Amino acid sequence: MMSTLVVLLTICLLMLPLTARQLDADQLADQLAERMEDISADQNRWFDPVKRCCMRPICMCPCCVNG
């Protein structure tokens, strides 16, 4: 009975850090996405205001692909 409790406790303690680490990674990705949404076209160094499109060499924007 005692060994069963020790095994169960060990499994729970091993699982806790793994799930907590995964949540931390998700939170960092969410924060990065929120920061990227805050950048306007005026602050983006790749954005060309005349063409109203980006100037990246490899761009999949609709204005770059069509024109």
UniProtKB/Swiss-Prot annotation:
Disulfide bond annotation, renumbered to this chain: C53-C63, C54-C61, C59-C64
Subcellular location: Secreted
MF GO annotations: ion channel inhibitor activity; toxin activity
Pfam families named in the record: Conotoxin (PF02950)
Chief place of localization: secreted
Signal sequence interval, chain numbering: 1-20
Keyword line: Cleavage on pair of basic residues, Disulfide bond, Neurotoxin, Secreted, Signal, Toxin
GO cellular component, one term: extracellular region
Tissues of expression: Expressed by the venom duct.
InterPro entries (UniProt xref): Conotoxin
Propeptide: 21-52
Function noted in UniProt: Probable neurotoxin.
UniProt domain comment: The cysteine framework is III (CC-C-C-CC). Classified in the M-1 branch, since 1 residue stands between the fourth and the fifth cysteine residues.
Family: Belongs to the conotoxin M superfamily.
Record-given protein name: Conotoxin Im3.1
Lineage, opening ranks: Eukaryota, Metazoa, Spiralia, Lophotrochozoa, Mollusca
